[in-house]
């Protein structure tokens, strides 16, 4: 079963403009109920270009810890819904601590922490 925090190789083509494309790693960010019942899955793209600008929506992941080809960055500003058929091979699973970083970056990307601050 596909689980939140899994890292898969996925085919993101075709793309337009600045979208991440090709066959590349993605992290599953959809909840596990959706992962179980939906034919689609919500993912964030991962890039091996760690020289990309360090912005609050980026989460670094280490190649040794996660058995990747190179140190990488999860791009939480590059989220999209994919048909599960685009997922090719499971590569690894992110730790709970790393997923907390993903959640924080995702909240920033979606503007959810601004909403939380307005309610307090």
Curated annotation (Swiss-Prot):
<dbReference type="InterPro" id="IPR011067">
    <property type="entry name" value="Plasmid_toxin/cell-grow_inhib"/>
</dbReference>
<keyword id="KW-0378">Hydrolase</keyword>
<dbReference type="GO" id="GO:0006402">
    <property type="term" value="P:mRNA catabolic process"/>
</dbReference>
<dbReference type="GO" id="GO:0003723">
    <property type="term" value="F:RNA binding"/>
</dbReference>
<dbReference type="GO" id="GO:0004521">
    <property type="term" value="F:RNA endonuclease activity"/>
</dbReference>
<comment type="subunit">
    <text>Homodimer. Forms a complex with MazE which inhibits the endoribonuclease activity of MazF.</text>
</comment>
<keyword id="KW-0255">Endonuclease</keyword>
<protein>
    <recommendedName>
        <fullName>Endoribonuclease MazF</fullName>
        <ecNumber>3.1.-.-</ecNumber>
    </recommendedName>
</protein>
<comment type="similarity">
    <text>Belongs to the PemK/MazF family.</text>
</comment>
<dbReference type="GO" id="GO:0016075">
    <property type="term" value="P:rRNA catabolic process"/>
</dbReference>
<dbReference type="GO" id="GO:0003677">
    <property type="term" value="F:DNA binding"/>
</dbReference>
<keyword id="KW-1277">Toxin-antitoxin system</keyword>
<keyword id="KW-0694">RNA-binding</keyword>
<comment type="function">
    <text>Toxic component of a type II toxin-antitoxin (TA) system, cannot be expressed in E.coli in the absence of cognate antitoxin MazE. Ribosome-independent, sequence-specific endoribonuclease that cleaves mRNA, thus inhibiting protein synthesis and inducing bacterial stasis; it cuts between the first and nucleotides of 5'-UACAU-3' in single-stranded RNA. Its endoribnuclease activity is neutralized by coexpression with cognate antitoxin MazE.</text>
</comment>
<keyword id="KW-0540">Nuclease</keyword>
<dbReference type="InterPro" id="IPR003477">
    <property type="entry name" value="PemK-like"/>
</dbReference>
<dbReference type="Pfam" id="PF02452">
    <property type="entry name" value="PemK_toxin"/>
</dbReference>
């Amino acid at each position: 079963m596909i689980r939140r925090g899994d890292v898969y190789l996925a085919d993101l083509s075709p793309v337009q403009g600045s979208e991440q494309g090709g066959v590349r790693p993605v992290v599953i960010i959809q909840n596990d109920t959706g992962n179980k019942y939906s034919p689609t899955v919500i993912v964030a793209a991962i890039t091996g270009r760690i020289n990309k600008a360090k912005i609050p929506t980026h989460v670094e992941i280490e190649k040794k810890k996660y058995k990747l080809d190179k140190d990488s960055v999860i791009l939480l500003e590059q989220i999209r819904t994919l048909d599960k058929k685009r997922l090719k091979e499971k590569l690894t699973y992110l730790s709970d601590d790393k997923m907390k970083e993903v959640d924080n970056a995702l909240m920033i990307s979606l503007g959810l922490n601004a909403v939380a601050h307005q309610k307090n």
